[in-house]
Amino acid sequence: MICLKILRFYQKFLSPLKPAACRYYPSCSEYALWQFQKKNFFLAFFSTFFRILRCNPFFKGGFDYPRVSKNFYPINLCFKPIFLAEKQLCFLYIPYKNKSFYLIKIIFKRTNQ
């Protein structure tokens, strides 16, 4: 998706040129990246837009994890353990309200032993 490439370009080349000034964690660009990875374009755009509007001296700041809605289905008792999984776990879904979750990215890399 073009939005993800633009955000990664901004994070890699433009963001290091200016001082860190975001009042929230995760930063606004990281928040936008997570939103565009997990929501459709319009929902991600509006969530990011309102987050950037809140990132100013009139708001307190702090932790503001993205919230996503997701339907989880009961899993089978026969599942692959994490070390046999084909994909690496990237996000944690922390329950917030009915079918709404905080999205938290796993920042530690798995080491092969």
UniProtKB/Swiss-Prot annotation:
Localization: Cell inner membrane
Membrane disposition: Peripheral membrane protein
Chief site of localization: membrane
GO cellular component: plasma membrane
Residue stretches spanning the membrane: none
Entry keywords, A to Z: Cell inner membrane, Cell membrane, Membrane
UniProt cross-references to PANTHER family, sorted A to Z: MEMBRANE PROTEIN INSERTION EFFICIENCY FACTOR-RELATED (PTHR33383:SF1)
Family: Belongs to the UPF0161 family.
Function: Could be involved in insertion of integral membrane proteins into the membrane.
Name of the protein this chain belongs to: Putative membrane protein insertion efficiency factor
Species assigned in the record: Campylobacter jejuni subsp. jejuni serotype O:2 (strain ATCC 700819 / NCTC 11168)
